[in-house]
A protein has these predicted regions:
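Pro/Thr/Ser/Gly-rich low-complexity, intrinsically disordered linker/stalk tracts
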Residues: 2-44, 82-83, 95-135, 171-176
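Recognizes extended acidic, P/S/T-rich segments that occur
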Residues: 47-84, 137-177
Length: 178
């Protein structure tokens, strides 16, 4: 004879934890800031949450969430004043068990100020882009000439420098009689 004791087997199914959570872009577009988040589609993500800090990362507030997102996901933040203030962003995802997992890196908007007291010389100054995992290698200064709607690179600036002077006289076009 043989006997078996009472046995019960439990199997728990856990959703995968996203392995990729990256805030790829924080762009100022006129009076709006566009924040782009790269996540993993099909990794059990139920919700995405966007957080913003307007006090240099001391505290973050939930500003947007979306259910069943598809990635890449871009959120447009209209509650900003990008001409006078820099903001920091972070994104998280919620799994099917309502756990907040997969926190992203922190992205920062760049506040650019222009001293245009001189008609021809323009002085640009900006805040450092902070909290990038490997730091900033360099900044690229782009200019837009009214005759050409696309931006063109006018300088590469070392990452420790947050100031650039440019003589826009080279962009002034003299009319001619043809």
């Amino acid at each position: 004879y043989s006997s078996l004791s009472n046995q019960i087997d439990f199997y728990a199914l856990q959703n995968p934890i996203p392995q990729y959570s990256y805030l790829s872009n924080v762009n100022v577009v006129e009076d709006t800031i566009e924040v782009t988040y790269q996540g993993e589609n099909g990794a059990g993500v139920k919700e995405v949450r966007f957080y913003k800090s307007d006090n240099n990362g001391i505290s973050y507030n939930l500003i947007h969430n979306d259910i069943n997102p598809l990635f890449p996901y871009t959120y447009k933040d209209f509650s900003v004043d990008p001409n006078n203030h820099s903001y920091m962003y972070q994104v998280s995802v919620i799994d099917a068990c309502d756990n907040e997992v997969g926190f992203s890196n922190i992205g920062t908007s760049i506040l650019l100020s222009v001293d245009d007291d001189d008609y021809v010389m323009k002085s640009l100054q900006w805040n450092a882009y902070r909290n990038w995992e490997f730091g900033v290698d360099h900044y690229e200064v782009l200019a837009n000439v009214n005759l050409n709607p696309s931006f063109q690179s006018i300088a590469i600036v070392d990452s420790t420098n947050h100031y650039f002077e440019h003589d826009i006289g080279s962009f002034i076009v003299e009319p001619f009689n043809g």
